[in-house]
Amino acid sequence: MTAVAIPAVRDYLTDLQGRIVAALEQAGGEAFRTDAWQRAEGGGGVSRLLEGGQLFERAGVLFSHVKGTRLPPSASAHRPELAGRGWEAMGVSMVLHPRNPYVPTTHMNVRMFVAAARPGHAESDVFWFGGGLDLTPYYPFEDDARHFHRACRDALDPHGADYYPRYKQWCDEYFFLKHRNETRGIGGIFFDDLNEPGFDASFALTCSVGDSFLPAYLPIVQARRDMPYGERERDFQAYRRGRYVEFNLVFDRGTLFGLQSGGRTESILLSMPPLAQWRYDWQPQAGTPEAALAEFLRPREWV
C-alpha cells in the first residue's frame, strides 16, 4: 500500500509547494529563491525562501522527502514498538514572517511518515499523517481570527463534523508555552498520528488542510498589509517574536525531529524570525494595543 501511496503523496506535496510560492510571489511582487539539497543518509528536498522582502521579511516554504534506517527518539517516543525500524518522512512546512507588524505570522505543515516493516518480522509498514495551520498575530483583530478559523473548519467539515473541534483543541494545547502560560497565537488546527480512517481518507483530509492555507491567510494579508506602523510597533513585534523562538527551540516536535535525525540545519531553522528580542520582566501598559494581545493568547471559540 505505502509503496504505491508514496509517489502520490510526494506529487501532491510538490504541487502544493509550487502553488503556495506562486501565490506569495504574486502577493509580494518578489521572487523566492530555490535551494535544492540532498541528504547523505537518504532523500533530500527543495527549499523556497525569501529574505528581506517588503511584504515578507522572511519566508520559507519547504518540501522534504527524507529516509533513514532507524527511527529517531522524537518519532518513536509515542510508539515504542516502532523503535529500530527504517523510515521515510515527507512534507511541506512553511513559516511566513511579514514585515508589517499588523500582518500576523503564520505556519502551515502537512506531512506523512512511514515506518517500514523489518525483514523477517511478522509486521507491516505503518503510516501516519499529520499537519495543521496556525496564526500568530502581534496586533490581533477579531475579524481575522474568525476568518482564519472558519477556513480551518470549512476544510475539515467535509471529512466529519467532529474533526474541527478536536483539531482546534489539539492546536490550542500543542502551541502552548508552558513557561509563559500563554498560547503562541490564536491557534488554528493541528493533528498527528492520523491513520485510523485508512490511507485514502487520511490522505484526503491532509490535502484539504494543505489546500486551505491560501484562502485562510491571504485575505488577512491583503486587509492589513498597508496599515501604517512605526518604531513602536516594530519593537513590539520583535519582542513577541521572541516567544516564537522559544516555542520552536523548546517544544516543537518538528524542530526536534529534524535535529535528532541529522536534518538540514539551514532548513530546520528557516522558521526562525529574522529579528527578535527579549526584555526582563516587561509588561505592556494597560489599555494599549499591545496589552490587548493578552486577551487573544488563551483558547477561545472563534466560530
UniProtKB/Swiss-Prot annotation:
Positions that bind a divalent metal cation: H97, H107, H149, H179
Listed cofactors: a divalent metal cation
Catalytic reaction equation(s): coproporphyrinogen III + O2 + 2 H(+) = protoporphyrinogen IX + 2 CO2 + 2 H2O
Active site annotation, chain numbering: H107 (proton donor)
Chain segments carrying region Important for dimerization: 244-279
Keywords: Cytoplasm, Heme biosynthesis, Metal-binding, Oxidoreductase, Porphyrin biosynthesis
Main location: cytoplasm
Its EC number(s): 1.3.3.3
GO biological process: protoporphyrinogen IX biosynthetic process
GO CC entries: cytoplasm
Oxidoreductase among keywords: yes
Residues making up the signal peptide according to the UniProt record: none
GO molecular function: coproporphyrinogen oxidase activity; metal ion binding; protein homodimerization activity
Role description: Involved in the heme biosynthesis. Catalyzes the aerobic oxidative decarboxylation of propionate groups of rings A and B of coproporphyrinogen-III to yield the vinyl groups in protoporphyrinogen-IX.
Subunit structure: Homodimer.
Protein name listed in UniProt: Oxygen-dependent coproporphyrinogen-III oxidase
Species whose genome carries this gene: Bordetella pertussis (strain Tohama I / ATCC BAA-589 / NCTC 13251)
Gene that encodes it: hemF
